[in-house]
Amino acid sequence: LTLERAELASEKGKGIKKDFKHNDFSNTTIIDILNEETAEKLGKAVGRYITIEIPELTFLSSDLPKIVETVKESLDLLLPHKNGLVLVAGVGNSDITADALGPFVASKILSTRHLSEDLQRSIGFSEPLRPVSAISTGVLGQTGLESSEYIKCIVNEINPCCVITIDALASRSVKRLGTTIQMSDTGIAPGSGINNKR
């Protein structure tokens, strides 16, 4: 987690900016890494990182609608504000529970790229849906392809305005497991949480 690296480094000054938001069900930390020197110290790329900590993150939570809205608002800070195609890429190994988040989420995405506006109207949508495509990349041991190779090929073919990549996240604290969402506009390094960088 970028939040943990910033805590460990106790980084202050011109190279980093932190903002905090708190409500009755979550804490959100927005960290902007502003220059290469700070990025190198933290081992993270220059960009924005949003960490949402939700102690009661379950599908059974009575706060679920508010949690979804909080995640949406944070995602809106990172996404381009236009109606272009979004590619959602779930990375990870669906056969290993701790690494299955990406493939699981990708399987739940409503893909709309193939739906014409006429068809959308005929099935009851009053406003056109944003075009979305979703894939699950698998892992090198399953496919013989690095996730990044697979995603790059698809990006070159369908030319989305952005890619949302979903992956499991490593944390130093057990309290953050299953309760923390990190988003960034910098991309990810699959496997980096277990020092598996290629």
Please provide the spans of the model-predicted regions.
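Short glycine-rich or small-residue beta-strand-to-loop segments that form or flank ligand, phosphate
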Residues: T51-P55, L85-I96, A134-G138
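An N-terminal, well-structured beta->alpha segment
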Residues: E37-H81
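A structural-propensity feature for long, helix-poor, extended segments
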Residues: G124-V155
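Glycine-rich phosphate/diphosphate-binding loop of Rossmann-like nucleotide-binding domains
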Residues: N93-R130, A134
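Proline-aspartate-enriched helix->loop->beta-strand connector
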Residues: V155, P160-C161
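N-terminal amphipathic/basic leader segments beginning at the initiator methionine
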Residues: L1-V46
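Gly/Ser/Thr-rich loops at beta-strand to alpha-helix junctions
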Residues: V91-L101, G141, A168-R172
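A structural signal for small-residue-enriched, beta-sheet-centric alpha/beta enzyme cores
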Residues: I135-S136, E149, T165-R198
